[in-house]
Amino acid sequence: MDKVDLLSLTMEEMESLFLEIGEKKFRAKQAFQWVNKGIKQYEEMTNLSKKLIKQLSEETRITHNRIEEKFVSKIDGTVKYLFLLDDGHIIEGVLMKYKHGFTACISTQVGCAMGCQFCASTTGGLIRNLRAGEMIDQILLMQQDQGERISNIVLMGSGEPLHNYDETIRFLKIVNDPEGLNIGNRHITLSTCGLVPEIKKLGALQIPINLAISLHAPNDQLRKQTMPIAQKYTIDQLIQSCYDYLENNNRRITFEYALIEDVNDGEKEAHELSKLLKGLLCHVNLIPINPIEERTYQKSKDSQVKKFQQILKSNGIEATIRREMGTDIQGACGQLRRKYVDDQEKKEISEV
């Protein structure tokens, strides 16, 4: 039986654990504070008794990711991390530096099962879900490495957060806790390819985070070409789930739209997208895709991206073009991990 990971526990769960072993609630609070500061050795919990430390070390564990590799963009200072997990798997995270502070883009799964054709994260399929502690530790390691506090989080790394629903919700509760990283919900963005039932469940929880929907097409026929999830849920169902979400959380929804040359970047698609989103409290984030070796899709021309944006704006839809960051270090989701895994496999074959 796996030991309980202290870094994956909410404050409430930590208190329940400590009550079960005959300890006071305030001891649970102390332990919660320690693990969310990034300590990895039980002996570092200096305000806990030696007896309790011994018991915890025997009956529990603390997630301990490691920075395997780090790449710093010479263009904009973006930092790309490869994290080594306890079981040897690799995940990636990105630290982006803005005037308003540091934003961490973290992974929620090892690989991804969603199969989106323009995303490198999914080329090897899903290997496993991450625990909440493995998500938290990505942030802790980035903070320790940079010596700076991270003020914003985006769940846009490898994996589909709502496909790992329970651990993602646990992560949100932990990271928002005043005794932990204390990052406000309004500084957290969750990106999903559109798991309709889970969007409704998330909305019902009334956690006021920012929701981003990976839409990438204005109609079902086009969306099915690049996103397998569209075979399961129609765009009408997805948009309705967004209206349902807004009933519980009056937070503007972002629709991510990756522009692919001669696929979804035409004037027709821009007008169709405008009609689809009319009246919805939303914003469109236009994303010039990064070319992926395993795929044949090409990035839209800058002039076409701007024309697409202008059409949306003229139709009353707020739209921005996402700033490209870390392009010289394979900063796009999944690219660096895929290259690392491929290189390791080639190395193993050459050593046989």
Curated annotation (Swiss-Prot):
GO MF annotation, one: rRNA binding
The record's CDD domains line, in alphabetical order, gives: Radical_SAM
Chain residues that bind S-adenosyl-L-methionine: 159-160, 191, 214-216, 290
Q: What PROSITE patterns does the database record attribute to this sequence?
A: RADICAL_SAM
**Needed cofactors:** [4Fe-4S] cluster
List cellular component terms (GO).
Answer: cytoplasm
Where in the chain are disulfide-linked cysteines found?
A: 105-333
Tell me the residue numbers annotated for binding [4Fe-4S] cluster: 112, 116, 119
Q: What class of enzyme is it?
A: transferase
What keywords are annotated for this sequence in UniProt? Answer: 4Fe-4S, Cytoplasm, Disulfide bond, Iron, Iron-sulfur, Metal-binding, Methyltransferase, rRNA processing, S-adenosyl-L-methionine, Transferase, tRNA processing
- EC code: 2.1.1.192
Pfam families noted in UniProt: Radical_SAM (PF04055), RlmN_N (PF21016)
Q: What else is known?
A: Reaction proceeds by a ping-pong mechanism involving intermediate methylation of a conserved cysteine residue.
Regarding protein family, the annotation reads: Belongs to the radical SAM superfamily. RlmN family.
NCBIfam families, per the entry: rRNA_mod_RlmN (TIGR00048)
What name does the UniProt record give this protein? Answer: Probable dual-specificity RNA methyltransferase RlmN
Its gene is rlmN
